[in-house]
Amino acid sequence: MKSPLHCFLSAIVVIVFSLSVSTLNVEGQGQTIPYDKIEILTDKIAPNLYMLSGSENVDPGHPDGAGGRIGVLAGPDGIFMVDAQYLQVGDKVISAVRKIDPGPIRFLVNTHIHPDHTAGNATFAKLGAVILAREELREGMLRTAGGDPARLPVITYGMGEPLKLRMNGETVELIPVRAAHTGGDTMIRFVNADVIMVGDFYRNFGYPFIDVANGGSLKGALEALDLTMKIAGPNTKLIPGHGTYIKRTDIVPYRDMILGVQAKVQQMIAQGKSETEVLAAKVTAPYDAKVPGGLLPAGNGTSADRFVRMVYQQLKDGK
């Protein structure tokens, strides 16, 4: 028999379902995604570690790869997954995972709350996977995401020491990141393979997206980049949530770009300039040609204008 608490929570989830995933402040919001055209591509990057990515030029919010990247650690101890993609491509993801290993999917950890990384959670929970994530992520889902209660994390953790799992000859570290891309970010480090999945606080396409509505912050994003450079070695393979793999040295110009824009915006705020005036000044001009997608129209989710507006608002609020 279900407990009163379980029934109550289920009722709350049903009520907020009308808000749906679309209420989350995410890239590509309001744009139609042709889910039927998304193919799942598999890349083996270590003896038992694989990356699954959606096909390029399909998802308007992520032309560099539809949906969020998935990590798959396979072996005799079962399967450990990182992120779950869109709900609508769940069967395709399952098929790709089964081609790697037919064993049980035991654990799934979310890097952050956005539905291109979490909407498929329920698909894998119903296959027996235990979902792990930051406590802030679970709280955010209960507030806004709605949908199937099975998609909620059942094991949560906060800031502090990394949570470690040992399976398939690998040590997996779940490293909590202070409010960066969102308020509940986690990096996943595969120690023996020398691989770190960094989620979306680093991006290859367009300017940084700091989702303030879901707890992200400019200061936290910079701290996350610093932490990544600290724990990554010279040969560590860094895997963003979308796009190409990078190394530690690739973070330096990305971080410098953020600091450069931040300094310029701060200077203009000190001069009494309004947000409109700051946007008109095109403070990202020195970087636009170097940032893939940096010259896209202002309405695009990866645009310079959205980034500059966020920087302005964060600095005005003293964050």
Locations of the language-model features?
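Metallo-beta-lactamase
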Residues: G78-F80, Y86-Q88, K164, T171, ...
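Accessory terminal helices/loops
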Residues: V16-L19, T23-T32, K230, T244-K319
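Bacterial N-terminal signal peptides that target proteins for export
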Residues: M1-V13, S22
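Active-site HxH/HxHxD metal-binding segment of metal-dependent hydrolases
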Residues: S95-R166, G183
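Short N-terminal segments immediately surrounding and downstream of signal-peptide cleavage
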Residues: V26-P47
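Acidic/histidine-rich helix-loop elements
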Residues: L52-G68, M141-G147, F205-G215
